[in-house]
């Protein structure tokens, strides 16, 4: 079975690499060009493309729209202690879209990467 891949469009590939490797335990699997990198965490490969890059992911659609960062679709990273993890990230100056919310399935918060792409940090309920 092929690995899971998700593509994010970003403003700055190097800033994105630093963010994901320093704060979320991703590793750099490949960085073959300034406008593209593959980051890995477990079974997830995160493909990051510069919004103005030369590759196909940055090309305009037939109607003229161009890919851009942001939106609401996101990856989810499960953590054991959401409150403690969020506190560490806040001290590092990272941006969150909201505060921790608790629902039937657990606790979550939305963290923005440097380009404004969301990452859901999630803590399941205690068993």
Please report, for each region that a protein language model flagged, where it lies by residue.
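Vicinal oxygen chelate
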Residues: 1-5, 27-78, 84-112, 123-127
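Catalytic core of Fe(II)/2-oxoglutarate
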Residues: 9
